[in-house]
Protein backbone atom coordinates (compact mmCIF):
# COMPACT_ATOMS: atom_id res chain seq x y z
CA UNK A 1 0.00 0.00 0.00
CA UNK A 2 1.29 3.45 -0.96
CA UNK A 3 -0.01 6.97 -0.42
CA UNK A 4 0.66 9.64 -3.04
CA UNK A 5 -0.10 13.36 -2.76
CA UNK A 6 -0.42 15.86 -5.59
CA UNK A 7 -1.86 19.28 -6.41
CA UNK A 8 -4.91 20.71 -8.14
CA UNK A 9 -6.33 18.90 -11.16
CA UNK A 10 -9.00 21.49 -12.14
CA UNK A 11 -11.30 18.89 -13.71
CA UNK A 12 -9.57 17.77 -16.93
CA UNK A 13 -7.21 20.75 -17.19
CA UNK A 14 -4.46 19.27 -15.03
CA UNK A 15 -5.52 15.65 -14.75
CA UNK A 16 -2.81 14.46 -17.15
CA UNK A 17 -0.36 14.07 -14.27
CA UNK A 18 -2.40 11.02 -13.25
CA UNK A 19 -2.26 9.41 -16.70
CA UNK A 20 -0.10 6.38 -17.45
CA UNK A 21 2.38 8.46 -19.46
CA UNK A 22 3.08 10.72 -16.48
CA UNK A 23 2.50 8.47 -13.46
CA UNK A 24 3.97 4.97 -13.34
CA UNK A 25 1.28 2.89 -11.67
CA UNK A 26 2.87 -0.52 -12.17
CA UNK A 27 1.98 -2.72 -9.23
CA UNK A 28 -0.62 -0.35 -7.80
CA UNK A 29 -4.13 -1.43 -6.78
CA UNK A 30 -7.22 0.17 -5.29
CA UNK A 31 -5.47 -0.26 -1.92
CA UNK A 32 -3.09 2.52 -3.01
CA UNK A 33 -4.20 6.13 -2.67
CA UNK A 34 -3.70 9.42 -4.51
CA UNK A 35 -4.68 12.47 -2.46
CA UNK A 36 -5.40 15.70 -4.36
CA UNK A 37 -4.85 18.93 -2.41
CA UNK A 38 -8.01 20.70 -3.55
CA UNK A 39 -9.45 22.15 -6.77
CA UNK A 40 -10.57 18.69 -7.83
CA UNK A 41 -13.13 20.31 -10.10
CA UNK A 42 -15.07 17.26 -11.26
CA UNK A 43 -18.19 17.88 -9.18
CA UNK A 44 -20.09 20.81 -10.68
CA UNK A 45 -23.16 19.86 -12.69
CA UNK A 46 -22.97 16.14 -13.56
CA UNK A 47 -21.99 17.00 -17.13
CA UNK A 48 -21.02 14.30 -19.60
CA UNK A 49 -17.43 15.48 -19.30
CA UNK A 50 -17.44 15.15 -15.52
CA UNK A 51 -18.98 11.69 -15.70
CA UNK A 52 -16.37 10.61 -18.24
CA UNK A 53 -13.47 11.73 -16.06
CA UNK A 54 -14.91 10.18 -12.92
CA UNK A 55 -15.22 6.88 -14.79
CA UNK A 56 -11.67 7.36 -16.03
CA UNK A 57 -10.42 7.77 -12.46
CA UNK A 58 -12.36 4.67 -11.48
CA UNK A 59 -10.41 2.70 -14.09
CA UNK A 60 -7.06 3.83 -12.73
CA UNK A 61 -5.27 1.37 -10.42
CA UNK A 62 -5.57 3.51 -7.29
CA UNK A 63 -8.24 5.12 -5.13
CA UNK A 64 -8.63 8.87 -5.60
CA UNK A 65 -9.06 11.07 -2.52
CA UNK A 66 -9.36 14.85 -2.43
CA UNK A 67 -9.93 17.78 -0.14
CA UNK A 68 -12.00 20.60 -1.56
CA UNK A 69 -10.45 23.79 -2.88
CA UNK A 70 -12.16 27.00 -3.90
CA UNK A 71 -12.93 25.75 -7.42
CA UNK A 72 -15.58 23.15 -6.57
CA UNK A 73 -19.32 22.89 -7.14
CA UNK A 74 -20.30 22.93 -3.50
CA UNK A 75 -24.06 22.65 -4.06
CA UNK A 76 -23.61 19.29 -5.76
CA UNK A 77 -20.66 18.19 -3.64
CA UNK A 78 -22.51 18.75 -0.36
CA UNK A 79 -25.54 16.84 -1.66
CA UNK A 80 -23.61 13.62 -2.25
CA UNK A 81 -24.03 10.62 0.06
CA UNK A 82 -21.94 10.92 3.22
CA UNK A 83 -20.37 7.91 4.84
CA UNK A 84 -17.58 7.06 7.27
CA UNK A 85 -14.35 5.83 5.73
CA UNK A 86 -11.14 5.01 7.60
CA UNK A 87 -12.31 6.92 10.65
CA UNK A 88 -13.50 10.13 9.00
CA UNK A 89 -16.48 11.53 7.10
CA UNK A 90 -16.38 11.45 3.30
CA UNK A 91 -18.59 12.11 0.30
CA UNK A 92 -18.49 9.21 -2.13
CA UNK A 93 -18.22 10.77 -5.57
CA UNK A 94 -17.66 7.58 -7.59
CA UNK A 95 -16.86 3.95 -6.86
CA UNK A 96 -13.26 4.74 -5.93
CA UNK A 97 -13.33 8.54 -5.65
CA UNK A 98 -13.89 10.13 -2.24
CA UNK A 99 -14.08 13.70 -0.95
CA UNK A 100 -12.29 13.93 2.40
CA UNK A 101 -14.47 16.31 4.35
CA UNK A 102 -13.18 19.24 6.37
CA UNK A 103 -11.91 18.78 9.89
CA UNK A 104 -11.54 14.99 9.67
CA UNK A 105 -8.78 12.64 10.81
CA UNK A 106 -8.29 9.54 8.67
CA UNK A 107 -6.25 6.45 9.45
CA UNK A 108 -4.73 5.47 6.12
CA UNK A 109 -2.04 2.80 5.99
CA UNK A 110 -1.19 3.46 9.63
CA UNK A 111 -0.86 7.22 9.14
CA UNK A 112 -3.14 9.74 10.83
CA UNK A 113 -4.03 12.31 8.17
CA UNK A 114 -5.91 15.51 9.05
CA UNK A 115 -7.88 17.19 6.27
CA UNK A 116 -9.11 20.78 6.07
CA UNK A 117 -10.21 21.95 2.63
CA UNK A 118 -11.30 25.38 1.51
CA UNK A 119 -9.70 28.60 0.30
CA UNK A 120 -10.65 32.06 -0.93
CA UNK A 121 -11.25 32.68 -4.62
CA UNK A 122 -9.52 35.59 -6.28
CA UNK A 123 -11.22 38.95 -6.63
CA UNK A 124 -11.41 38.26 -10.38
CA UNK A 125 -13.32 35.03 -9.78
CA UNK A 126 -15.73 36.62 -7.34
CA UNK A 127 -16.38 39.43 -9.82
CA UNK A 128 -16.68 37.41 -13.03
CA UNK A 129 -18.31 34.20 -11.79
CA UNK A 130 -21.91 33.64 -10.74
CA UNK A 131 -22.43 33.15 -7.01
CA UNK A 132 -24.13 29.84 -6.30
CA UNK A 133 -23.27 28.46 -9.72
CA UNK A 134 -19.60 28.96 -10.53
CA UNK A 135 -18.51 30.55 -7.25
CA UNK A 136 -19.69 29.59 -3.78
CA UNK A 137 -19.47 31.26 -0.38
CA UNK A 138 -19.07 27.71 0.98
CA UNK A 139 -15.49 27.76 -0.31
CA UNK A 140 -14.50 29.13 3.11
CA UNK A 141 -15.13 26.80 6.08
CA UNK A 142 -17.87 28.10 8.34
CA UNK A 143 -17.82 28.31 12.13
CA UNK A 144 -19.41 24.89 12.58
CA UNK A 145 -16.81 23.23 10.36
CA UNK A 146 -14.00 24.97 12.19
CA UNK A 147 -15.42 23.98 15.57
CA UNK A 148 -15.70 20.37 14.38
CA UNK A 149 -12.07 20.48 13.25
CA UNK A 150 -10.96 21.67 16.68
CA UNK A 151 -12.98 18.89 18.32
CA UNK A 152 -11.30 16.35 16.03
CA UNK A 153 -7.85 17.62 16.98
CA UNK A 154 -8.75 17.77 20.67
CA UNK A 155 -9.73 14.10 20.51
CA UNK A 156 -6.37 13.32 18.87
CA UNK A 157 -4.41 15.32 21.48
CA UNK A 158 -3.34 17.66 18.67
CA UNK A 159 -1.07 15.04 17.15
CA UNK A 160 -1.14 13.57 13.63
CA UNK A 161 1.23 12.49 10.89
CA UNK A 162 0.19 14.56 7.86
CA UNK A 163 -2.04 17.52 7.10
CA UNK A 164 -3.75 18.07 3.74
CA UNK A 165 -5.19 21.50 2.93
CA UNK A 166 -5.78 23.56 -0.19
CA UNK A 167 -4.26 26.87 0.93
CA UNK A 168 -1.31 27.27 3.28
CA UNK A 169 -1.13 28.86 6.73
CA UNK A 170 -0.15 32.52 6.67
CA UNK A 171 3.42 32.03 7.88
CA UNK A 172 4.21 30.32 4.57
CA UNK A 173 3.81 33.56 2.62
CA UNK A 174 7.54 34.19 2.29
CA UNK A 175 8.25 30.66 1.12
CA UNK A 176 5.50 30.88 -1.48
CA UNK A 177 6.68 34.29 -2.71
CA UNK A 178 10.13 32.87 -3.44
CA UNK A 179 8.55 30.69 -6.15
CA UNK A 180 5.53 32.59 -7.49
CA UNK A 181 3.70 35.90 -7.42
CA UNK A 182 0.32 34.22 -6.96
CA UNK A 183 -0.10 35.82 -3.54
CA UNK A 184 -1.08 38.93 -5.50
CA UNK A 185 -4.11 36.92 -6.61
CA UNK A 186 -4.57 34.79 -3.51
CA UNK A 187 -3.26 36.81 -0.56
CA UNK A 188 -3.17 35.48 2.95
CA UNK A 189 -6.45 36.18 4.69
CA UNK A 190 -8.60 35.43 7.71
CA UNK A 191 -8.84 31.73 6.84
CA UNK A 192 -5.10 31.26 6.33
CA UNK A 193 -4.63 33.05 9.67
CA UNK A 194 -6.96 30.48 11.22
CA UNK A 195 -4.95 27.66 9.63
CA UNK A 196 -1.89 29.27 11.17
CA UNK A 197 -3.37 28.81 14.65
CA UNK A 198 -3.74 25.12 13.81
CA UNK A 199 -0.19 24.82 12.52
CA UNK A 200 1.25 26.59 15.55
CA UNK A 201 -0.42 24.18 17.97
CA UNK A 202 -0.39 20.89 16.07
CA UNK A 203 2.31 18.23 16.25
CA UNK A 204 2.72 16.73 12.77
CA UNK A 205 5.31 15.31 10.38
CA UNK A 206 4.48 17.27 7.23
CA UNK A 207 1.84 19.60 5.78
CA UNK A 208 0.82 19.50 2.09
CA UNK A 209 -1.18 22.13 0.20
CA UNK A 210 -2.09 23.04 -3.38
CA UNK A 211 -3.63 26.32 -4.59
CA UNK A 212 -0.46 28.22 -5.55
CA UNK A 213 0.45 26.25 -8.71
CA UNK A 214 4.01 25.55 -7.58
CA UNK A 215 6.00 22.49 -6.60
CA UNK A 216 8.17 23.59 -3.72
CA UNK A 217 9.00 23.06 -0.09
CA UNK A 218 7.82 26.41 1.24
CA UNK A 219 8.71 25.83 4.89
CA UNK A 220 10.64 23.20 6.82
CA UNK A 221 7.55 21.05 7.25
CA UNK A 222 5.27 22.40 4.50
CA UNK A 223 5.23 21.54 0.79
CA UNK A 224 3.07 23.02 -1.97
CA UNK A 225 2.27 20.71 -4.88
CA UNK A 226 0.89 21.23 -8.36
CA UNK A 227 2.29 19.05 -11.16
CA UNK A 228 4.60 16.86 -9.10
CA UNK A 229 3.49 13.78 -7.16
CA UNK A 230 4.90 12.96 -3.74
CA UNK A 231 4.91 9.48 -2.23
CA UNK A 232 4.84 9.22 1.54
CA UNK A 233 7.50 7.17 3.25
CA UNK A 234 6.45 3.72 4.38
CA UNK A 235 5.14 4.10 7.95
CA UNK A 236 7.22 1.12 9.04
CA UNK A 237 10.34 2.91 7.78
CA UNK A 238 9.40 6.00 9.76
CA UNK A 239 8.72 3.96 12.88
CA UNK A 240 12.00 2.06 12.68
CA UNK A 241 14.41 4.82 11.65
CA UNK A 242 16.37 7.39 13.59
CA UNK A 243 17.74 8.95 10.40
CA UNK A 244 17.19 12.69 10.77
CA UNK A 245 16.88 13.32 7.02
CA UNK A 246 14.15 10.69 6.64
CA UNK A 247 12.29 11.99 9.67
CA UNK A 248 12.56 15.63 8.57
CA UNK A 249 11.32 14.95 5.02
CA UNK A 250 9.04 11.89 5.19
CA UNK A 251 8.22 11.79 1.47
CA UNK A 252 9.88 11.64 -1.94
CA UNK A 253 8.92 13.40 -5.16
CA UNK A 254 8.40 11.07 -8.08
CA UNK A 255 10.50 11.82 -11.17
CA UNK A 256 9.15 14.71 -13.20
CA UNK A 257 7.61 13.50 -16.49
CA UNK A 258 9.40 14.55 -19.65
CA UNK A 259 7.53 16.75 -22.11
CA UNK A 260 4.20 18.52 -21.84
CA UNK A 261 1.51 17.12 -19.61
CA UNK A 262 -1.45 16.94 -21.98
CA UNK A 263 -4.82 15.73 -20.76
CA UNK A 264 -5.52 12.26 -22.21
CA UNK A 265 -8.82 13.28 -23.84
CA UNK A 266 -10.06 10.74 -26.40
CA UNK A 267 -11.54 12.10 -29.63
CA UNK A 268 -15.15 11.31 -28.82
CA UNK A 269 -14.96 13.07 -25.46
CA UNK A 270 -13.29 16.14 -26.94
CA UNK A 271 -16.34 16.54 -29.22
CA UNK A 272 -18.83 16.71 -26.33
CA UNK A 273 -20.48 20.12 -26.31
CA UNK A 274 -20.06 20.66 -22.58
CA UNK A 275 -16.49 19.34 -22.38
CA UNK A 276 -15.51 22.71 -20.97
CA UNK A 277 -18.71 23.23 -19.04
CA UNK A 278 -16.93 25.69 -16.76
CA UNK A 279 -14.27 28.17 -17.73
CA UNK A 280 -11.59 28.00 -15.04
CA UNK A 281 -9.19 30.90 -14.92
CA UNK A 282 -5.85 29.39 -13.88
CA UNK A 283 -4.17 32.79 -13.72
Language-model segments: what does each one mean?
Residues 95, 109-187:
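Active-site-proximal loop/helix segment associated with metal-binding centers of metalloenzymes
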Residues 246-283:
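A short C-terminal boundary segment appended to hydrolase-like catalytic domains
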Residues 6, 12-107, 184, 188, ...:
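Core catalytic region of metal-dependent phosphoesterases/phosphodiesterases
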Residues 63-67, 83-87, 91, 95, ...:
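Conserved beta-sheet core of the metallophosphoesterase superfamily
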Residues 1-4, 104-115, 162, 219-223:
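Beta-strand-turn-beta hairpins that frame and shape the catalytic cleft
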Residues 10-11, 41-42, 71-73, 118-122, ...:
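Short, solvent-exposed loop/turn segments at secondary-structure junctions
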Residues 15-16, 45-48, 76-79, 167, ...:
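A short acidic (Asp/Glu
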Amino acid sequence: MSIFVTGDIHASYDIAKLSESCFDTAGLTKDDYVIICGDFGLVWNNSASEQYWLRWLDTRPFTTLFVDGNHEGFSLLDSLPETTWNGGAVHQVATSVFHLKRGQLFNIDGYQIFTMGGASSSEYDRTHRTQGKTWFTEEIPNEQERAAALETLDAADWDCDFVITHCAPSSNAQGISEHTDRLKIHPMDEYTDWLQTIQDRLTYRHWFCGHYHIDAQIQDKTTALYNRIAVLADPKTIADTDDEETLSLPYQLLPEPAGTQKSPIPDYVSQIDDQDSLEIDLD
